[in-house]
Amino acid sequence: MIETKRLYVRLFREEDAEALYKIKTDPQVMEYCPDLLDVKVEREDIPRYIREFQALEDSGDIDEWRCYAIENKETGEIMGALTFSKQKMLHEYELGWMMIGAYTGKGYASEAAEAFAEYFCEGHGIDYLIVVMDVDNPASRRTAEKSGFRLFEKRTVYDYSYNRYCDDYFYFRRYWTGSILKDRYYGDSPYYGR
């Protein structure tokens, strides 16, 4: 479990099934993250997914997709989720987030992402994490920047994702503070690393 000033970032538990279903069915989440779990997942399927998350965590294999709860320390409410996976095409570790609409714009996602990135990189000896997002998602761009990710480049690929065709996306990186590579890639140009 990761603790921040206002949050816990932890594995989902079976008692969080309703909260995870709420995240999965939130219209704001679905706009950019329709592939969270399976597209046609039903409420009764959620506990099985949570057990799979636990099994993946227990396996220690960091190359497999994972999903963590973002919990409000004060209220115990699950407000969103962080996802982590080894991006198949890029062969890099990718972090993602999704917040229930009522909790957006309050800095929770950036607080969770920053803490998770530092904790995970340090714990696994990973130099950096990436975030990949549609250029039409300005809220996620702000979250990435607030949590220490820097725009590395804008890439083009013709892909059907997020329920629509997307040809441009932003590619961000956040280096672990202990990484010797950090200074090599974080320059002063608008596209860091170029």
Could you say what each language-model-derived stretch is?
Residues M1-A102, G123, R164-R194:
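GNAT-family acyltransferases
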Residues V9, L20, L95, A113-F116, ...:
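Hydrophobic packing within well-folded, soluble alpha/beta domains
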Residues F12, Y119-C121, F149:
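Conserved hydrophobic/aromatic "anchor" residues
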Residues V41, P138, D159-S161:
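Generic structural signal for helix capping and beta-alpha/helix-loop junctions
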Residues F84-K86, A117-E118, V135, S161:
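Short, contiguous, well-ordered secondary-structure segments
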Residues W97-M99, G105-Y119, P138-K146:
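Conserved acetyl-CoA-binding loop-helix of GNAT-fold acetyltransferases
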Residues K106, E122-D127:
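Short coil/turn segments at alpha/beta junctions that flank glycine-rich nucleotide-binding fingerprints
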Residues I130-V132, R150-D167:
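Conserved catalytic-core motifs of GNAT/GCN5-like acyltransferases
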